[in-house]
Amino acid sequence: DEELAHHLNADAKKYIADNNIQLYTINAIDKAIEIGMGKRTNTILQSAFFKLADVMPIDKAVEYMKAAAKKSYSKKGDAVVEMNYKAIDAGVDAVHKVEVPESWKNPEADAPKAERTGRPEVVKLVNELLDPIAKMDGDSLPVSAFADKADGQYVTGASAYEKRGTAVTVPQWDPEKCIQCNNCAFVCSHATIRPFLLTDDEVKAAPDNMKVADMKPKAGAYKYTMSVSPLDCMGCGECITVCPTAAISMQPQESQAAEQPVFDYLVANVSKKTDAGMVDTTPKGSQFNQPLLEFSGSCAGCAETSYARLITQLFGEQMYISNATGCSSIWGNPAATSPYTVNINSKKGPAWSNSLFEDNAEHGLGMEVGQRYLRDQAIELVKEIAASDKATAEFKAAADKFLETKDDTKANVEPTTALIAELEKAAAAGCEKSKEVLAKKDYLGKKSVWIFGGDGWAYDIGFGGLDHVLASGENVNVMVFDTEMYSNTGGQASKASNIGEVCQFAAAGKETSKKSLSEIAMSYGYVYVAPVSYTHLRAHETE
């Protein structure tokens, strides 16, 4: 009860006391672990509900629940059935009533919250919209709160402020055992475990409890650390699964609280080291790139976000994403809480949009054609300015470099920045065409257009549009999250499901074979297809 009082805020205490609410708690997590059910608390909580709700006699509820458990799990063996029986009994027995003290009617004021820092537009969004929504008080928001978002546009990066702390256990890194392969970061679905290289000055300025190691296999100018955000971690344990040297162990979240300031310091203050010999396009090297998809609402261990996060590490600052409805649109952009974000230095990141389910491929194609049209207009103006007598030697040099690299997404980044600087000088000197180009400057750099969606979209509902886009020969990238069933709607069979596959809502098993989307795409002869899985050779993904 004392711990509960510490965690409840003053408003909650007063509301409970003033309304004479009967308050109960149950330590379902410890009970589940004790029984052998791991983190599965649903059965325990269900029986606790029946104990308190009084919708039927509790002995009848227990009888029905145990009958359902036997029917559901008997094929998995008596031991599993018995564990569920114990969970049902535990839910009834472990409910604890909290005696609400009189002092809660006039509770002490909460300690003042630390002022949020970061991009002003994101902090404003979190304070004005995300906070009320997170408190289940979104209905109190006036229409005027959404006036500047009438077109549906939201700034990205708000997920970093949620800090939900939902994991029971989180990773702890052992620098002595670590071989610095970065496999743990490579598979992390929520970007909550990240490697960093630090200078001596960055190490000195860090929190005292930060652990570091010399770089391997050969010590260099930088120190290496692997940091975890315990308040963002979902506790899936994928990092442990892929670690070849047992350098990661799962520890109670409370024991790792001191790691949060370390992670926050590293994210905000440690720069990427471009001279450390790390190749961006290798599994190890890619993980030193800032992930521009972080702390999403996807399920613990979700592989979809692992792949999407990796793509943002390779192309994120130049990405346009057209996203089909499905799991990837739910974790990709829940209202006001975009997990996509911007590079901490350039302030650029993926631009994300969701159209109708069946129109996603066409929507993505429209993104490519539309931005290319605007870019071509700007490029023609740049050529005209460079050809004029008034163009400076510096402008001509910047324009030449930009035009040389205009078809290479990576190589075009720095020349675009240099050209914009020269355009600003020319505009200040009165060049009207430079002002026209600057009005379209966001389109100057070569973009990487991506179309995201699941197999329900790609194989079934949106296949006609996808086939049209693949056949068009346009320069777009398509990422299909092939879960071999309709995941977001609960588990129906799709054309991606294998013969005999049993899904939640296809219990009889699929009678036909899996559709070969890759062979259909390859039949055109000019579409590059790459099935990837990080459970196999990880280098294939970055390639």
Language-model segments: what does each one mean?
Residues 87-88, 92-172, 180-182, 201-216, ...:
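Flexible inter-domain linker/hinge segments
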Residues 73-74, 359-429:
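N-terminal leader/propeptide and maturation segments of large enzyme subunits in energy/redox metabolism
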Residues 158-159, 172, 183-203, 229, ...:
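Iron-sulfur cluster-binding cysteine motifs and their immediate structural context
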Residues 1-131, 203-208, 335, 501:
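Active-site cofactor/cluster-binding pocket
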